[in-house]
């Protein structure tokens, strides 16, 4: 099975180490453009752009990078309760049209009550999912060209419609991640691809089975994806050393403050991430080659696959065998790690690459000329 491999735009900061400004770099437009263009050239199918008050706005970032990329798709956030579903549908169609069909959408209900209150959303966990279901029903129908009247508990629209259709028909695909039962119910009814954070394979298999069963009960099929960091090197020893370096500047106080902040979240997925390490930097390998060190101070995706290319590829295959066809990867720093993943991992997995433009001569990668007149060949050919 060919796998869709996405990269990540770190609009909330980037650097060589977690939890410190040492080794950090400015995430300005020029740097984001570097990462996006690298992902585009290396064969990643798309990039996830995060959302929230700690991030730059995902829609504006995507719009700014469309003109400087060729094939890369942009997975941007839909925020139910913060914007009207009809307005969001118009924005989605516009982004899809401006990008000539390179827009993808990620439904984000939110998990931080403090941040949501600051954005004017004062709904509890269950109410947010109720509102998200209503939002998505309207958004989908409007994008598909219907005139929509909807009288819901949280959202009411009358005569909602779209004049300029999206390029992708009947509409761009919708992605969504959530671990609660309410989230799984929403995924089963509304989305094309259900995302999970990188839990051990057995836990991921259980979630996939639950969503698949719920979708089948509604006569639907859902695809599956996973969000993971990757630390891949020439050898396993080098990869684990890189993992240790990534958290080498973290002290216990920083970890404790981060975990206290994340504890206020009502996100079930965030709670499951925190349970993998318990705020303790000992025994962070929670499953073979699955390392929970990132989650000591980072909200959201908190695990990384660690190893050499063949080892990480074997773990990717384990998840793929569960039914996952889309992998959203990242690594610190994101520019350099995009190259490492492409060069050390892509060799060992079946990557569904975007169509490449035709090139002539030696524009395709061939290495440096040997002794001025000898074309280098692959080690596998010798």
Curated annotation (Swiss-Prot):
Name of this protein: Alkanesulfonate monooxygenase
Enzyme class label: oxidoreductase
Catalytic activity: an alkanesulfonate + FMNH2 + O2 = an aldehyde + FMN + sulfite + H2O + 2 H(+)
Record note on what altering residue 167 to I does: In strain: Blue1
Cross-referenced Gene3D superfamilies: Luciferase-like domain
UniProt keyword annotations, A-Z: Flavoprotein, FMN, Monooxygenase, Oxidoreductase
One of the Pfam families matching this protein, by short name: Bac_luciferase
Family: Belongs to the SsuD family.
Gene source species: Pseudomonas sp
């Amino acid at each position: 099975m060919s796998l869709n491999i996405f990269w990540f735009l770190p609009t909330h900061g980037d650097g060589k180490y977690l939890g410190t400004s040492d080794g950090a770099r400015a995430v300005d437009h020029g740097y984001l453009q570097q990462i996006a263009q690298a992902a585009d050239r290396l064969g990643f199918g798309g990039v996830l752009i995060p959302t929230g008050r700690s991030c730059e706005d995902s829609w504006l970032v995507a719009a700014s990078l469309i003109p400087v990329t060729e094939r890369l798709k942009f997975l941007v956030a839909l925020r139910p309760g913060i914007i009207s579903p009809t307005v969001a549908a118009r924005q989605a169609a516009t982004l899809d049209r401006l990008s000539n069909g390179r827009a993808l959408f990620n439904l984000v209900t939110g998990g931080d009550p403090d941040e949501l209150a600051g954005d004017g959303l004062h709904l509890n966990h269950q109410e947010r999912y109720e509102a998200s279901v209503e939002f998505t029903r309207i958004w989908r129908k409007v994008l598909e060209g219907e005139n929509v009247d909807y009288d819901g508990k949280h959202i009411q629209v009358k005569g909602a419609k779209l004049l300029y259709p999206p390029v992708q028909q009947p509409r761009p695909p919708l992605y969504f991640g959530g671990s609660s039962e309410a989230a799984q119910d929403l995924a089963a009814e509304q989305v094309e691809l259900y995302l999970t954070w990188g839990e051990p394979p057995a836990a991921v298999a259980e979630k996939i089975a639950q969503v698949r069963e719920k979708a089948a009960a509604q006569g639907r099929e859902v695809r599956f994806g996973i969000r993971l960091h990757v630390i891949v090197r020439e050898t396993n020893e080098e990869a684990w050393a890189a993992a240790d370096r990534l958290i080498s500047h973290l002290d216990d106080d920083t970890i404790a403050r981060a975990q206290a902040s994340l504890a206020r979240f009502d996100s079930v997925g965030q709670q499951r991430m925190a349970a993998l390490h318990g705020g303790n930097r000992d025994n962070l390998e929670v499953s073979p080659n699955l390392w929970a060190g990132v989650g000591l101070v980072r909200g959201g995706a908190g695990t990384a696959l660690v190893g050499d290319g063949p080892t990480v590829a074997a773990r990717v295959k384990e998840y793929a065998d569960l039914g996952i066809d889309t992998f959203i990867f990242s690594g610190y720093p994101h520019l350099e790690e995009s190259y490492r993943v492409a060069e050390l991992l892509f060799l060992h997995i079946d990557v569904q690459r975007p169509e490449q433009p035709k090139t002539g001569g030696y524009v395709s990668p061939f290495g440096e000329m040997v002794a001025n007149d000898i074309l280098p060949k692959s080690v596998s050919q010798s």
